């Protein structure tokens, strides 16, 4: 079983990997955009991780408002990477993603919206299909004034829904360079300001549980969740 606190970011260089470890992370999901995917880049990032005794997992974020294109990309990348994210914002995309158990994380459901991008129906779908909701801390930090308060409100609203319906939640630094990297304690401290400490702890541990689940499904002996070939 995978243990530890794992960040989700866009860090692929050796200095970034060293910084993540120094800041206290146990591992990292290195996320590429689906239209820029490079197996060579992720392989080199994994090698940097191995060199510095740091776990690196592969991720792809699919960004499109076209459902057919999104579903084709999901089929294309599901078996190529450890973690699959889809950028939200469009309400139809939000709903479709939460209906699909092939996706791990709905990223930024509030993106470019006047509301939080979720309701009780969508939260239940996420719970049923094990699709996590992402709180992107980097997006919050980059925003200003009204936009920042709007994102913060969306975070709080989505946390209430997720907690009520037991929908998984992850928090990410979303860092793309060493200057965007935050320590686990910083993200945990932020969560403590918008929800209770026990729930904050659960959120911090969710990314590693998602990875553990996907690694389990990749085993040759596992046909699907709960169905495994046992050799006598």
UniProtKB/Swiss-Prot annotation:
GO process annotations (BP): tRNA 5'-leader removal
Enzyme Commission number(s): 3.1.26.5
GO molecular function: ribonuclease P activity
Major site of localization recorded for this protein: cytoplasm
Catalyses which reaction(s): Endonucleolytic cleavage of RNA, removing 5'-extranucleotides from tRNA precursor
Keyword Cytoplasm applies: yes
Keyword Phosphoprotein listed: no
Keywords tagged on the record: Cytoplasm, Endonuclease, Hydrolase, Nuclease, tRNA processing
One GO term describing the cellular component: ribonuclease P complex
Subunit structure comment from the entry: Consists of a catalytic RNA component and at least 4-5 protein subunits.
Function text: Part of ribonuclease P, a protein complex that generates mature tRNA molecules by cleaving their 5'-ends.
Protein name according to UniProt: Ribonuclease P protein component 3
Organism field: Methanococcus maripaludis (strain C6 / ATCC BAA-1332)
Gene name tied to this protein: rnp3
